[in-house]
Amino acid sequence: MPTQAANEALAILRDASQFQWYVITLLLVVIYIYASEIHQKNYRAVFAGLAFWGMDWFNEIWNALVFHFTNYAAVWMAPGKTAYLILIGLNIEISMMFAIMGVAATKLLPEDRKAKIFGINNRIFYAIVLSAACVVVEIILNAANVLVWEYWWWNAKMPLLIFLIGYLPFFLVAYWVYDMDLVEKQAAVSFGILAIDAVLLIVFAGLMEWI
């Protein structure tokens, strides 16, 4: 039987009547950030950002599938106020935030990919620090009851999986793409991740209507 939070999320899932005009402003911010990077020919930041965004979409898809198969709860849910709830744990505001975060994360990186911070490779160091910071933000959002967790192994008292699954792979993949030598490789990986996401959405949301 679905939890209260799950039912609340389902009640507004892909409900266009929830739309708010601030979404247009958020969209313009995302477009501006990517357009600025493209104008500066900083394509590695663009593809790192897209890879990061694609990684989140993959997580959101399997999270929604957890609810489908359990009929109890997704691992995380976003039942609160939103301009559009795309999936049970993903609203339009969160999605745009993730679209920006990958680009922003590259701004911390030194040019020397082998440079160390406190004896740790800078890419790994920033991936760990930023992932930990994101977990802290999620705990605050959970405390505010806008991001709901129902499982004992995924909550404020057990943050390790949130760190290891919810964020660390995103930053590691984004930095991996960022450091690739060829733009063609960066594009292939980023668009490949997004293509997989698109296929999964077509199958599970469009054809099977599971999520």
UniProtKB/Swiss-Prot annotation:
This protein's record includes keyword Transmembrane helix: yes
What superkingdom heads the lineage? Archaea
Signal peptide positions are none
Q: Does the keyword Cell membrane apply?
A: yes
Per UniProt, the keywords (alphabetical) are:
Cell membrane, Membrane, Transmembrane, Transmembrane helix
Q: In which broad location class does this protein mainly occur, judging by the first location in its UniProt entry?
A: membrane
Where is this protein localized, as stated in its record? Cell membrane
Its Gene Ontology cellular component terms are:
plasma membrane
In Swiss-Prot or TrEMBL terms, this protein is called Uncharacterized protein AF_2236
This protein's species is: Archaeoglobus fulgidus (strain ATCC 49558 / DSM 4304 / JCM 9628 / NBRC 100126 / VC-16)
